[in-house]
């Protein structure tokens, strides 16, 4: 039996719960993630993030102004030592509809990826294909994944450093074939909050023996970099995420996002700047000697030091 929480832990849990619910609710509202009548397929891996996502969505479901279904789905990828009983027991205790899928993607990954190489990319691609197909089978209108704000920021830096792209994880995504809408309700949540929440809630965490324990992954290096920034410069991570929500294509260099080629000056645009002040009289800028005796504030006068004549 799990140990009872202390009063201090209960207070902390309540505070965390309110914060996470508020952040998830804001993300759902900002990106219109869940609508009335939706059937949400909540993908459960057995990790802290997906447990927290399911827990918070179930709570919000009771208070939401719209009606929606939640169906939990886990994909058993046949990793050695995977405790098959853990998730069914947990989901039974919640008394919610769920499906456990079985597909041996583990063998495929081990066969295709040389020893010591990162397996995450192929593993996630195989898992995604299976889950997308199953979502269509059960009539799910949304697929909820447990990626949080740190995942989104890390992905942006990974794509910058190793892919040469300014690309991250969108909170809401339409699949390439247009058949599925993927949502990330934890998009505004910090990983450290989710870790603490999972610990206090005592979720039955299942570690990933295939990729989660591999060292020297590129993502881990980026995560370490961001954690160091967070320690040295509090608030920087929040600022980075805010910047990702406030892009200005016209101030960048991506010709696909902004039509720089067609930029033309407007010859009829009004003059702006100090010399355009309404209280300044019009004068000939080439009248260096000021023969018109116009009294101008020296700070606002253009000082023409030389005139070039062709």
Curated annotation (Swiss-Prot):
Top EC category: transferase
Cofactor dependency: Mg(2+); [4Fe-4S] cluster
Gene3D superfamilies given in the database record: HUPs (3.40.50.620)
Keywords, sorted A to Z: 4Fe-4S, ATP-binding, Cytoplasm, Iron, Iron-sulfur, Magnesium, Metal-binding, Nucleotide-binding, RNA-binding, Transferase, tRNA processing, tRNA-binding
Something else known: The thiolation reaction likely consists of two steps: a first activation step by ATP to form an adenylated intermediate of the target base of tRNA, and a second nucleophilic substitution step of the sulfur (S) atom supplied by the hydrosulfide attached to the Fe-S cluster.
The family this protein is said to belong to: Belongs to the TtcA family.
Protein name, entry field: tRNA-cytidine(32) 2-sulfurtransferase
Organism: Shewanella sp. (strain ANA-3)
Lineage, uppermost ranks: Bacteria, Pseudomonadati, Pseudomonadota, Gammaproteobacteria, Alteromonadales
């Amino acid at each position: 039996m799990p140990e009872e929480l202390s009063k201090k832990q209960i207070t902390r849990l309540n505070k965390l719960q309110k914060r996470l619910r508020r952040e998830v609710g804001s993300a759902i509202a900002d990106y219109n993630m869940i609508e009335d009548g939706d059937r949400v397929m909540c993908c459960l891996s057995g990790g802290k993030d997906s447990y927290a996502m399911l827990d918070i969505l179930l709570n919000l479901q009771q208070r939401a102004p719209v009606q929606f279904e939640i169906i939990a789905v886990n994909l058993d990828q046949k990793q050695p030592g995977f405790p098959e009983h853990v998730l069914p027991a947990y989901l039974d205790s919640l008394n919610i509809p769920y499906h456990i899928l079985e597909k041996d993607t583990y063998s495929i990954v081990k066969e295709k990826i040389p020893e010591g190489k990162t397996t995450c990319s192929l593993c996630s691609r195989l898992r995604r294909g299976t889950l997308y197909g199953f979502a269509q089978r059960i009539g799910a209108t949304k697929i909820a994944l447990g990626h949080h704000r740190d995942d989104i920021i890390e992905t942006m830096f990974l794509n910058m450093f190793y892919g040469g792209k300014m690309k991250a994880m969108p909170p809401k995504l339409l699949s390439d074939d247009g058949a599925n809408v993927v949502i990330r309700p934890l998009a505004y949540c910090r990983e450290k909050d989710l870790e603490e929440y999972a610990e206090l809630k005592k979720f039955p965490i299942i570690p990933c023996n295939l990729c989660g324990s591999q060292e020297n992954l590129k993502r881990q290096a980026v995560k370490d970099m961001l954690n160091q920034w967070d320690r040295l410069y509090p608030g920087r991570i929040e600022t980075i995420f805010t910047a990702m929500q406030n892009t200005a294509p016209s101030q960048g260099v991506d010709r696909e996002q902004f039509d720089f080629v067609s930029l033309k000056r407007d010859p009829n645009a009004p003059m702006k700047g100090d010399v355009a002040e309404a209280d300044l009289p019009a004068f000939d800028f080439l009248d260096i000697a000021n023969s018109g005796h116009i009294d101008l504030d020296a700070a606002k006068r253009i000082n023409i030091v030389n005139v070039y004549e062709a």
